[in-house]
Each structure stands twice: as structure tokens, then as C-alpha cells.
């Protein structure tokens, strides 16, 4: 891939990372930048997973590097601390694009070699006139729009809406996708193991995703050294790398947790073996195979699933049957494995997107040679993705980051409380040196020792009784009718979870408009708060407990 194209790709990705203003899931902050901020600046809240040792500090440590450098140089301004992780994420996305291009270029080379062989066979076996006809046909095909798998795959990657929408966020899933792509390109066993170990340290499920590739390396080793020696080399090398990677991760995690913990095992046991992640939402088994695959790959998924047909009908395409079927196999294996887990999110199968787009590019190149309709369909699909990037990246659910931008650009606030559902907004990493104390509705999970199930949290109380929660938390009173048995039960439930007067009145409060309407008379106006600004969150809301508008209220000082 030429350097000028890499530079343009990085600029494009950096533009998206710096300008996209919408939110998807709290993990984009609370499992990355907020943990990194806590490591470097010693301030902020750590989600409950870090109390149970379910996460390795490896990924946040990478994010913490630019924070540490800024602090060391004394350049840790509000804007710099916010912008630095976006540069890092743009680099990760660019490397994914480069990997997509390189894997597509490998297919180009195999196809070009096979087509030359077929052309030579044709010239030797056919008449001169027919040979001339074939040369004209090849020449025309090279002047087509989609004549290179590598460039077509890069175009699909750059224009894919979910790659732009999700890829700009500091998820472990995104860097996991990069490591998986790099692993797929390894022909030597040791680099393959090291990259697999690194990916598994960030997300332990990567080990399952990449496990089929071990058999490929096993086959190569037995072919080269014989079955016994080859198997011995594979197992011995694997054990050495496994001990080295796990040892390094354990030492790094010990420095953070202050105790020995095997985070990949704890994560796998909690989320997969015990399936406790189901308490965060459940979906049917076909969720990934059906709506998610179509949603994240977009309409180009039609070309992806057509790849086996092209391999079967096109003689020259059989030269790339192994890598294409391999990518389809890894994608299907990934979707199948994640489908066994009840808790499902679209970003969990992010790695499937680049594999699907490379396969779609292969089909596009082969079909566009003989069908103008395919070229027009591709243009229409790319246009659809561009529209989706705008809607999902700049319109839908943008309220929380607009609030953060307002705080970054405004005066210093001593105490800011976010009265909304669990982790609605990011923390100090988005408003460095602008807020002395950030408060929010606590949703830290505490597992019951007897049942092993999560206990009721403040967040659940807030969802059930938003007005009473605010009154009880700040003023130590509620409006339940204690003479009514059901109302009395609700009051007891609230009092058992939320401490009365557990938080002082903040200088500013952020909440949805619906919550503001409920507490405006009994709390906001009573304590001298006025509406500072209303932010458009989304033209429509699909998620529960969301609103079209988010409001910021400030306390008027006399």
C-alpha cells in the first residue's frame, strides 16, 4: 500500500475519530480512557469489573501512554487529554485498513498468476483469431471500475458505516480485530502465537476465534517434520509462548490490582462458563447470524455470501479458494461461537466486518467484469453507507458528548452530578481539569454471596423511582404514601439501597428532560437551580430510559 494512500487513510480516520459526536455503549469510555485516566492522574471511578479482576490492564495501559507523556511534558490540557486517545484510535483503524488492503492484494496476486496461466493455455490450444478475442476481453476487464480486490476492499472498509461508527470508539473489540487480521497473515508459528496471545490478553474470546488456525500450523509442521516431531514442536512452542504471555499479563495486572489474578480466566469464567453476562441483556441465538451480520456489513453482505458461488462457477477464482473460504470459515466460526453466549452486542463480532468486506470485494471484482448492474449496485451500497455514517455518527444519540463539549469549553465546575442511567456520560478523561468532582447514579454490581446473583443497585432504584431517588439522595425525604402498603414497600426498597442525604447539592446537574420535569418543582426550583441549556440527544429514541433531549441545570448563587 503506497505511503500517500496510508497518509490519506489516517487523515480520514482521524477526522472521523475527532468529529463523530454520538455514543454507542459506556464501555467506549469506562473500560478504556477512564481506566487509563485513573492510572495516570489517580482520579476517577473504576467500573465494577475492575473490582472482581475481570479485565486485564493491558489495553487501558496502551491508552494511558499518551496520557502519561502529556503529563510528563506538562502539556496535559483539557483538549490534549481529550484528543490524544483519538489519535491512537485513528492509528488502530488505519492499520486495520492497511491489513484489509494487504489481504486483498494477496488475492490479487493469486488471481493474476492464475489468469496468466489460463491465458497461456488458451493461446497454446486455440486458434490465433480466438486468442486475439481473449486478449481484447482481458484488456476490457482491466479498464473496469472494480479491477483490484485490494483497492475495492479498501474502499469498502473506508465507507462501511459500522467500521466508522464503532471503529472510532476505544473498544477492546477494535484492537482485537486488528490483532486477528495480523494473525491471519502470519505463516510462521511463533509470530502467530504471540499475536494470538496478545489478542487473547485483551479479549480472551480471541483465543477461541483463532483456535482453528492452530490446525493449519499443525498440518504445516507435520508435513515438514513428520507427525510426531511436528506435533511435539507445536505443543512445546505453544506452551513456552503461553507461559510467557500469561506471565507477562499477570505481572502487569499485579502492578495494577496489587494481587495476583489471572484476568483472562476470570473473564471467561464470569461471562462464558457462568454466563452471568446475561443479566446485561439477552438475545436469541440467531441474533448475530441474522440482523447483526446484515446490519454491520451492510448491503455488501449480499456479495459476501455469494463468494462460494463465484468460486464454484469461475475457474480462475479457484486459485483463491483457500484464503476466501478460510476467511468465510473464521467469520462463521466467530458468529457461531458468540451465538452460544446469551449476552450479545454488535461490537463483539467487529472482527467479522473486515473479513466479510474482503470477501465481498473479491466477488465484486469478478462480477463487475461482466455485469454493469453489479457496479451500479456497489455505488448505491457505498452511498447508503455514507448516509448511515452521517446519521449514526452525527445525529443519533449525540447528547452526552455535546454535554461534555459544553463542559470542556465552559468555566470550571466544582461539583457536577449526572442524574441518568448507568454510565450515560464519560468521566474525567473528557473534561480534564474542568470538574473537581463528578457524581453519578451508582450501578456497581455486587454479587450476592448466597445466590451468586447481582444485588439491586442504585441505578435500578433510579429507573423505578426517579423523583423519589433524587429527593432521598439529596434531601433525605420522599413522597411515598406510607399508609399505602405498596407505596410503603417501595419506600423500604429505596431506603435499603440508597443512603439518605448521601450526596451534597451539586453546582450543576445533567439529566434527561423527562427526569427534569419530574423533579423541577419539588427539587430543582426549590433549591435554586435554573435551566442552563437543552441538548438534542436524538430525533427519536429506541433505547429504554432515554429521551429526545438532555438538559443541564446550574445552581444560582446569590
UniProtKB/Swiss-Prot annotation:
Q: Which InterPro entries match?
A: GPI_mannosylTrfase
Residues annotated as glycosylated are 220, 275
UniProt GO BP: GPI anchor biosynthetic process
Q: What domain of life?
A: Eukaryota
Check the record and name the Pfam families matching this protein: Glyco_transf_22 (PF03901)
GO MF terms here are: alpha-1,2-mannosyltransferase activity; mannosyltransferase activity
* This enzyme's EC code(s): 2.4.1.-
Q: Where are the transmembrane segments?
A: 53-73, 81-101, 164-184, 190-210, 234-254, 292-312, 323-343, 348-368, 372-392
Is Endoplasmic reticulum one of the keywords? yes
Q: What's in the keyword line of the UniProt record? A: Endoplasmic reticulum, Glycoprotein, Glycosyltransferase, GPI-anchor biosynthesis, Membrane, Transferase, Transmembrane, Transmembrane helix
Which Gene Ontology terms of cellular component type are present? endoplasmic reticulum membrane
Summarizing the function annotation, the protein's role is:
Mannosyltransferase involved in glycosylphosphatidylinositol-anchor biosynthesis. Transfers the third alpha-1,2-mannose to Man2-GlcN-acyl-PI during GPI precursor assembly.
Q: What else is known?
A: The protozoan parasite evades the immune response of mammalian hosts and digestion in the gut of the insect vector by means of its coat proteins tethered to the cell surface via GPI-anchors. GPI10 is essential for growth of mammalian stage bloodstream form, while procyclic form (insect stage parasites) are viable but grow slower, suggesting that inhibition of GPI synthesis may be an effective chemotherapy against African trypanosomiasis.
| Name of the protein in its database record | GPI mannosyltransferase 3
The gene behind this protein is GPI10
